[in-house]
């Protein structure tokens, strides 16, 4: 925390030299804090690299002793990955799955946020439809897939619906919770300063709910990835799911791990992207600026 | 903002009653109070006697159960014109910068950006927050955050300033600094306004008040109103050195300790 500047009200036009000195101190403090943060970041990166080497090393040595038709090693997987990327095979199967992910997730974000806000704002809508949402959220989505196939076929449309259903609920529910959890104290501040309802939503409720919404998006991403592979496996077997099934059924263990690792990396990458967006749109939730 | 002729009381409560939970909890009952224009009224009283509720009623944030409450001579229906509030919990919006928080009240009341800029900058300077315009509340100390709360209210140029234990969450030194700043501000003729200041600190009440209202609990009502013997201008040292300071302080403390009705003493077994 910064020190309280000792400026009293009697002295409205402050002493410029003192003010400049204070400004310099502030810059100094900011630089020192930044240096400390950078050091800590590097240290953490180093620890992770070491850990990665140890785990991969154990896998490499241990994995090599096992039956290679059931198990593979990191070096073999890397070789397979390079081959699959160079030949375009990985991308060929990943692209259609990503497209489904993109469609389904986008629709889920829009519908989820809008519905969450409506449910939170209008108690009639909440009372009339809230229990369907609870019910559907509690139903394992996989159980609905045969029905979706009957209705929408085996292709992109069906897969998009499946993805939507996997991703939609956490977004709606978190948006709803975010609005319901806005501190009554802040709402009262808005009312005390005579906000209109629209202004109250814009300046108080929506920003306060934003971190919840982002958490919902993060949950939805995880579920969306599950939905993506599930859709590939349970409808027309295609995309990245097909790649896993095909390589597994032919005991190409090294090639099979490539799409699996790719999915993991994809999840990490998307969460990281979301975190960047969050810092951009909700800078007050940043925790790393504190000492 | 609202202009009321100086002889209309700023606030007038007539047999005002506020109950919660279908009448199970009485915040205050049959309360009569008059706050004159430009007067600083400090309210002290035990916890739970209805001080915050009274302030929220004046701010139009909650309805009366019965009786009348007038602000600038008009019955309160929703937040009245010319009233601004400073909260014990600061109530800053974490997603807005210091400047935007300070501008919030003005903007919500439709001020144009030129006015906003002029007034917010002026009060940010006045409370020593120059250069912090772009900081966010979480980057500030508690004392600085409450200064922003003060700027937000003052920038609206209210004719009535409501303060609910504004300095209670601060450490003793910061509290004293802010008390002195507020005192200095209220001695500027152009800044003087009616102020209702709730506090648990008798010293703070003695320092700031024209009059001090002592509230009692269950049901909350105004027990006694004392007129401050300290004239204007005044300062912390002068007030505390005045022989009447210790006397008044002892008196108020004894009032707050001893309920007027001895039957309201709780048996010792219940207090632990
Ligand atoms: N919204 C509410 N619903 C129900 N009861 C309430 C509500 N607000 C206040 N009360 C009750 O009304 C009484 C007065 O509360 P109030 O907050 O006004 O007291 P206070 O004098 O400000 O106390 P403190 O000094 O602790 O801040 C208390 O018994 C409190 O529990
Ligand atoms: Mg209170």
Model regions and ranges:
Chain B
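The feature captures the beta-strand-to-loop junction immediately N-terminal to the Walker
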Residues: 44-46
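Conserved ABC transporter NBD signature motif
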Residues: 67-79
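Helix-to-loop junction immediately C-terminal to a conserved catalytic motif
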Residues: 59
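Conserved ABC ATPase "signature" region
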Residues: 107, 114-132, 184
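Short coil-to-helix segment of the ABC ATPase nucleotide-binding domain corresponding to the Q-loop/switch region
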Residues: 96-103
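A short, proline-enriched helix->beta-strand linker immediately N-terminal to the Walker B motif
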Residues: 155-159
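Conserved ABC ATPase signature
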Residues: 136-140, 144
């Amino acid at each position: 925390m910064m020190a309280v500047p000792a400026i009293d009200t009697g002295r409205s036009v402050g002493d410029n030299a003192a003010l400049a000195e204070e400004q310099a101190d502030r810059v100094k403090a900011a630089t020192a804090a930044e240096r400390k943060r950078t050091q800590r970041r590097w240290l953490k990166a180093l620890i992770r690299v070491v850990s990665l080497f140890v785990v991969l090393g154990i896998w490499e040595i241990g994995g090599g002793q096992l039956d290679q038709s059931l198990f593979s090693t990191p070096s073999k997987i890397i070789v397979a990955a390079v081959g699959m990327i160079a030949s375009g095979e990985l991308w060929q199967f990943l692209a259609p799955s990503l497209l489904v992910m993109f469609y389904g997730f986008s629709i889920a974000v829009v519908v989820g946020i809008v519905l969450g806000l409506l449910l939170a704002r209008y108690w009639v809508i909440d009372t009339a439809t809230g229990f369907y949402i609870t019910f559907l959220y509690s139903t394992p989505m996989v159980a609905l897939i045969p029905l979706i196939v009957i209705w929408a076929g085996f292709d992109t449309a069906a897969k998009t619906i499946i993805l939507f259903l996997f991703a939609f609920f956490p977004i709606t529910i978190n948006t709803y919770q975010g609005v319901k959890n806005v501190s009554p104290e802040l709402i009262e501040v808005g009312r005390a300063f005579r906000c209109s309802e629209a202004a109250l939503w814009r300046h108080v409720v929506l920003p306060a709910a934003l971190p919840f919404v982002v958490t919902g998006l993060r949950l939805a991403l995880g579920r969306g990835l599950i939905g993506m592979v599930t859709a590939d496996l349970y409808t027309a077997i295609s995309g990245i799911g097909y790649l896993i099934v095909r390589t597994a059924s032919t005991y190409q263990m090294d090639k099979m791990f490539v799409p699996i690792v790719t999915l993991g990396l994809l999840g990490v990458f998307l969460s990281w992207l979301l975190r960047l967006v969050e810092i951009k749109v909700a800078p007050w939730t940043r925790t790393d600026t504190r000492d | 903002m609202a202009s009321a002729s100086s002889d209309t009381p700023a606030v007038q409560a007539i047999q005002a009653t506020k109950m919660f939970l279908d009448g199970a909890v009485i915040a205050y009952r049959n309360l009569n109070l008059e706050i004159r224009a430009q007067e600083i009224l400090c309210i002290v009283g035990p916890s739970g006697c209805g001080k915050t509720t009274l302030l929220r009623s004046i701010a139009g944030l909650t309805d009366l159960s019965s009786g009348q409450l007038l602000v600038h001579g008009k019955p309160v229906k929703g937040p009245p014109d010319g009233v601004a509030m400073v909260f014990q919990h600061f109530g800053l919006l974490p997603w807005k910068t210091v400047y935007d928080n300070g501008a919030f009240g003005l903007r919500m009341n439709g001020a144009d950006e030129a006015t906003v800029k002029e007034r917010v900058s002026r009060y940010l300077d006045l409370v020593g927050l120059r250069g912090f315009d772009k900081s966010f509340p979480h980057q500030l100390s508690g004392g600085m955050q409450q200064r922003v709360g003060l700027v937000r209210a003052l920038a609206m140029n209210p004719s009535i300033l409501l303060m609910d234990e504004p300095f209670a969450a601060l450490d003793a030194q910061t509290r004293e600094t802010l008390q002195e700043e507020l005192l200095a501000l209220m001695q500027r003729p152009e800044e003087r306004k009616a102020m209702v200041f709730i506090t648990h600190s008798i010293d703070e009440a003695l320092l700031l008040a024209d009059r001090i209202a002592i509230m009692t609990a269950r049901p909350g009502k105004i027990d006694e109103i004392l007129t401050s013997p300290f004239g204007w201008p005044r300062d912390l040292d002068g007030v505390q050195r005045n022989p009447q300071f210790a006397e008044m302080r002892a008196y108020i403390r004894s009032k707050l300790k001893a309920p007027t009705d001895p039957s309201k003493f709780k048996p010792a077994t219940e207090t632990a």
